[in-house]
């Protein structure tokens, strides 16, 4: 990575000295992408510096029209910086910019059918190279030379755009239906490419494509379909569509056979975590715990000055979910909770993703911990969880933090503060979870947290002698509970 960055920086400096703006934008954009892929603690800062270099040239004459694919890649990388830092507000605005550009490119940009990326070269380019490089440099009809690179077709780029749009949308909360829509559209694009009727379409398989290039493009589309389907599986979990999520697991398993060139452990790790999520969401806590404790999801060591990898993040999430299962004193593995929490804290408390920070503080409120041994200490710990959730506008985490706060501090209290807090928790849960089940006939129980918040609020209304309101709220809560998976329903009623 270090050598790649040095080479790209040298190209950028050389291009600046030659007033070769297209090359300069391209090399700065690629440098930003390499920084993000490097995973160092300074990667986002360094990527932003390279992005600023590229954007400083966006108003140069003809520069946007000459390299449309590069500007699209720059928007992708720019959005990725905000995703890495879990900055949901930045991500929202950058997502709008990216989508606007993609729509413009789809309608207007001159885009070679094979996805070839052409970088126009400045007048100081050694024109003899074009005659001796066998197609690496090409000459246009107007006599200008250009560098040709193999890249994504317009359809493939749009599929990537749908995938990134879904990730950015989920950053603010898991119940936004737009994420589901983006993934479905992305899958439609990719799946259409595999149909026999599509094989002779120029935008899918250009006639000039070599066998090696066509094979590589086909393999890329298979991996892209797998990744889109994986994201969709987690969206189904967020929507409480457990049957759809389970079907997705089977599709992912069968799809592994087609992905021979990919790291099997990496893909199996995702499948295992999705299976555990489904088991936990449907109340099969023993099965979920067993999967979370598999070697594939074991917490690995983290090298100094490195951001956590996907492997680290999945292991952290698996450990967090283990704690949610074993924290009750009655659980036969409760004795592991304190040690597991202690091993998690160095990885999670200062994680770059605020959702993980919020989750670890949330769990510290539950688990026997020195920081939350007193009422004041517990309030402070929960406040950290709330602040992290608010910083990224994550509605799902806010709902859960509010429910825990109300349960701990207002459960048997009558007063204005308790009334306001319990009602706020109920309204927030209802609004958040209502979005996940609108128009969803397959959902097996939208509104678990609405039921939790509604049940607590109904208790308060009864203590305030607002019996008619309490009765109506009980009926609404019972209707939600009736839709829950049987094992979840049993746990809810037991509590």
Predicted regions, residues:
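Extended alpha-helical scaffold regions
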Residues: 1-495
